[in-house]
Amino acid sequence: MISTPENYCCVIEKKLYFGNRKLAENEEKLKEIGIKSIIDLIGYKNDNERIKHSKFFNLLNLNIIDTPLNNADWAEKGVNFIDEQIEINNPIYVHCEQGLSRSATLIMYYLMTREKKTFKDSFFYLKQLRNVVCPTTGFIKSLCLLDQKLFDKNSFNIDDYSLFTLKESFPLINENDIKELYDKNKKFYNENFDLYNKEANDKKSEPIGYKTIDDLLEKFGKEKMLLRKGCSLHHPFD
């Protein structure tokens, strides 16, 4: 199943689903699917929405900020809630705003810790289900650390992820050209770590990937860029 940004995805049949806010606001559709529990990773805009959902669904509300400076330390709480709901046969829907980053991160954390999939296997499994998945690099770094902890290896490190994302965004540009610019920027920021930290904090972005995108646009032009609905070009890095 290939998903669009409007769709939800079934990760485990009749047990675990994830996607965006749009479905979370459609009570009739949730009931049609059989959803009984919800994890909201963005927080409700007002208490009335929270009360409405609480009447019909078991709810875990986590207000998670989606930036490269944030990590995934919160994910264990979400995974424990998933365990509890699956144990009592309550199908659960995990969502963030667009179903790209926060919800995908929690699902990958679940697949790694409960299904014993490596980070690489978890990531590409979700990409097959929902091709717009693109967590920010802060969450990716946390999943890389989890990969090392669980499997004593990095099956897919931050450079692998960044290069994959860049190649996906610029499919008409030679991979070697992308890697050359990425490696140049990585070397520059490794040698200027104070500047790296300053830009990361000032712009709330991942400087290496962000700068590489800008360099690619400047060198090759926007006509080489793939326009993807639901996920901005810089999203994984800002």
PLM feature spans:
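Intrinsically disordered, low-complexity segments enriched in polar/charged small residues
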Residues: L100, I107, L233-H234
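Secondary-structure junction/capping motif
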Residues: S103, T118, K187-E191
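Short amphipathic alpha-helical interaction/hinge segments
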Residues: A104, F151-N154
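Generic structural signal for isolated residues within well-ordered alpha-helices
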Residues: Y109-Y110, Y125, T165, D215
